[in-house]
């Protein structure tokens, strides 16, 4: 069984950053994806240099913080922050400019290349890259930069490499239990492909509280990720 354990939200806050690198160093986290528009983004890039075995990709966002680009009126609220929330799927009319989304996401990706770093892969905050109106954008950017993308699409776009064969998002909230890993193993132990677990380990700080409604659960995830013992035939990649 081949397993990727990806920690989302690198760059969100220093507490999140330290929680992720410690969950990598002391636990089973193998990769992370970075929000490149947040207060602790520079801190996350600094930590990357200290943990070269930790794969780091881009956590594309339209729903956390403020955009990097300045000419994006369809993406922001009157305060200049992203106007979408995690409930974007409930919108009857999204009103987004595809051109503005593409320019913003390319700017987020470019934060890596400006520092001479190639990201490992692409995924997104609240899985928004799998939203039907956005899929043409993620396809073009993935092909332009030749980067694999987190799966989770209802119909994966042609010509896009996937980061894994399966994404399991059950390790969250009430699902953060040792039983989760037992059930995952039983389900996939004979599977030939690669499974990705999405997780959100963190130490709690005030910046995290300001930007996320999922707070205490992140510390619980950290504790589980640093103490769990996986079956001997599970290969972390």
Swiss-Prot record:
Assigned keywords, A-Z: Carbohydrate metabolism, Hydrolase, Magnesium, Metal-binding
UniProt-listed GO biological process terms: polysaccharide catabolic process
GO MF terms, alphabetically ordered: deacetylase activity; hydrolase activity, acting on carbon-nitrogen (but not peptide) bonds, in linear amides; metal ion binding
Short name of one Pfam family: YdjC
SUPFAM superfamilies per the UniProt record, alphabetical: Glycoside hydrolase/deacetylase (SSF88713)
Record-listed Mg(2+) binding positions: 59, 125
EC class (word): hydrolase
Cofactor(s) required, per the database record: Mg(2+)
Family: Belongs to the YdjC deacetylase family.
HAMAP family: COD
PANTHER family: CARBOHYDRATE DEACETYLASE, YDJC DEACETYLASE FAMILY MEMBER
Protein role: Probably catalyzes the deacetylation of acetylated carbohydrates an important step in the degradation of oligosaccharides.
Name the record gives this protein: Carbohydrate deacetylase
UniProt source species: Halalkalibacterium halodurans (strain ATCC BAA-125 / DSM 18197 / FERM 7344 / JCM 9153 / C-125) (Bacillus halodurans)
């Amino acid at each position: 069984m081949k397993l990727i354990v990806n920690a989302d939200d690198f760059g969100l806050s220093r507490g999140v950053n330290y929680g992720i690198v410690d969950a990598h160093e002391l636990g089973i986290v193998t990769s992370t994806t970075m929000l490149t528009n947040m207060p602790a983004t520079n801190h996350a890039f600094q930590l990357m240099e200290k943990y070269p075995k930790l794969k780091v990709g881009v956590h594309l966002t339209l729903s956390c913080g403020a955009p990097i680009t300045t000419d994006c009126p369809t993406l922001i609220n009157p305060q200049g922050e992203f106007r979408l929330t995690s409930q974007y799927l409930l919108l009857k009319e999204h009103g987004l400019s595809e051109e503005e989304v593409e320019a913003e996401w390319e700017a987020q990706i470019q934060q890596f290349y400006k520092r001479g770093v190639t990201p490992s892969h692409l995924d997104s905050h609240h899985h928004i890259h799998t939203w039907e109106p956005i899929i043409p954008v993620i396809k073009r950017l993935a092909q332009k930069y030749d980067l694999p993308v987190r799966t989770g699409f209802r119909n994966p776009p042609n010509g896009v490499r996937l980061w894994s064969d399966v994404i399991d998002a059950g390790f969250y909230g009430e699902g953060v239990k040792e039983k989760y890993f037992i059930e995952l193993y039983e389900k996939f132990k004979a599977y030939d492909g690669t499974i990705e677990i999405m997780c959100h380990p963190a130490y709690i700080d005030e910046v995290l509280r300001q930007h996320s409604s999922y707070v205490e659960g992140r510390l619980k995830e950290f504790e589980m990720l640093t103490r769990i013992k996986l079956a001997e035939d599970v290969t972390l990649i």
